Amino acid sequence: MKAKIVLGAVILASGLLAGCSSSNNAQLDQISSDVNRLNTQVQQLSSDVQSANAQAKAAYEAARANQRLDNQVTTYKK
């Protein structure tokens, strides 16, 4: 008796899964397209952030170099 119930449950579950997998291919394609578009945007934003960080670091180092030069000029004045 238990074997029949388990077999019935397996058949019912496989039927439900087969029905769900083929019903919304258009929606699945749309969602896949949206995910790919969002992944592209995330990669672009990540690249932009890395570029901005590099520019900020370069500006900081330039300011430090200018400060060192200013300090040298004040110490060597006669």
From Swiss-Prot:
Q: Where is the lipid attached (N-palmitoyl cysteine)?
A: C20
| Source species, domain of life | Bacteria
- Can you cite a GO biological process for this protein? periplasmic space organization
Q: Where is the secretion signal located?
A: 1-19
Q: Give coiled-coil spans as residue ranges.
A: 28-62
Q: Which GO terms describe its molecular function?
A: lipid binding; peptidoglycan binding
Q: Does the keyword Nucleotidyltransferase apply?
A: no
UniProt-annotated location(s): Cell outer membrane; Secreted, Cell wall
Lipid-binding residues (covalent, S-diacylglycerol cysteine): C20
Modified residues annotated as N6-murein peptidoglycan lysine in this record:
K78
**Would you tell me the Gene Ontology cellular component terms?**
cell outer membrane; extracellular region
Pfam families this protein is in? LPP (PF04728)
Q: Which family does it belong to?
A: Belongs to the Lpp family.
Q: What is the documented function of this protein?
A: A highly abundant outer membrane lipoprotein that controls the distance between the inner and outer membranes. The only protein known to be covalently linked to the peptidoglycan network (PGN). Also non-covalently binds the PGN. The link between the cell outer membrane and PGN contributes to maintenance of the structural and functional integrity of the cell envelope, and maintains the correct distance between the PGN and the outer membrane.
Protein name, as recorded:
Major outer membrane lipoprotein Lpp
Native source organism of the sequence: Proteus mirabilis
